[in-house]
Amino acid sequence: MLIIAGLGNPGSKYAGNRHNIGFMAVDAIWQRQGFSSWSKKFKAEIAEGEIAGERVLLIKPQTFMNLSGEAVGEAMRFYKLAPKDIVVIYDELDLIAGKARIKIGGGHGGHNGIKSIDAHCGKEYRRLRLGIGHPGVKDLVHAHVLGDFAKADQAWLSSLLDTIADNAGMLVKGEDSQLMNKIALATGGKPDAEEPQAPKKQVGQSHIHKARNAAQPKKLPATGPMADMLKKMFGSKGD
């Protein structure tokens, strides 16, 4: 069994936030892979299903970001799983918008949701980081992370979410390199591109208060089933 946890903040107020891209990714998998209806358990919304012959639990913690580990840890212990049986999907300022990276273990990078999961589950779980870019100025980071994606972001965002949902079997089977290649090709990146070097992080700061290298997302054609959902989500919002 595998737990796939998407991180975000609960409620319609935060639904379109960049910080909620983890929720969006899990919603896309749920929509594409034919899971059960969402229900409430473990301080979270959960749905059960099967991907690539493996039983999978999708989970969206409803504790708010900083306490995400309470929900994921409770589910892990209930099903008698180990950190290796968990995949966490979340936003990453260190990555250009639309890029993705996956790894096992590592530091929390100032992300309070990851810090909480580390505390409740240990560190040796898989982390799928989805780039949301950086606004370029430290003072704008908080508003950027807790602000909605702009209409101009919908094309790459739709492609990214579609690709994750379509290739969820790769995520479940641990075919990480293949999945990264699929995402890079779908979002206009280079499959083997080297991840840019991030500046040294300051201890004790939340990632929404850090200054990081600025990078602008590419505009891509809006295609795929997720496009309509995103248009509904952001249609009434300005850029």
Curated annotation (Swiss-Prot):
Its EC number is 3.1.1.29. The active site is at 19 (proton acceptor). Monomer. Hydrolyzes ribosome-free peptidyl-tRNAs (with 1 or more amino acids incorporated), which drop off the ribosome during protein synthesis, or as a result of ribosome stalling. Catalyzes the release of premature peptidyl moieties from peptidyl-tRNA molecules trapped in stalled 50S ribosomal subunits, and thus maintains levels of free tRNAs and 50S ribosomes. One of its GO terms (molecular function) is tRNA binding. This is Peptidyl-tRNA hydrolase. It comes from Sinorhizobium fredii (strain NBRC 101917 / NGR234). Keywords: Cytoplasm, Hydrolase, RNA-binding, tRNA-binding. One of its GO terms (cellular component) is cytoplasm. Pfam families: Pept_tRNA_hydro. TRNA binds at residues 14, 64, 66, 112. The record marks 91 as: Stabilizes the basic form of H active site to accept a proton. CDD domains: PTH. Residues 188-225 are annotated as: Disordered. The gene is pth. It is found in: Cytoplasm. Signal peptide: none annotated. It catalyses: an N-acyl-L-alpha-aminoacyl-tRNA + H2O = an N-acyl-L-amino acid + a tRNA + H(+). One of its GO terms (biological process) is rescue of stalled ribosome. Belongs to the PTH family. The record marks 9 as: Discriminates between blocked and unblocked aminoacyl-tRNA. InterPro entries: Pept_tRNA_hydro, Pept_tRNA_hydro_CS, Pept_tRNA_hydro_sf. HAMAP family: Pept_tRNA_hydro_bact.
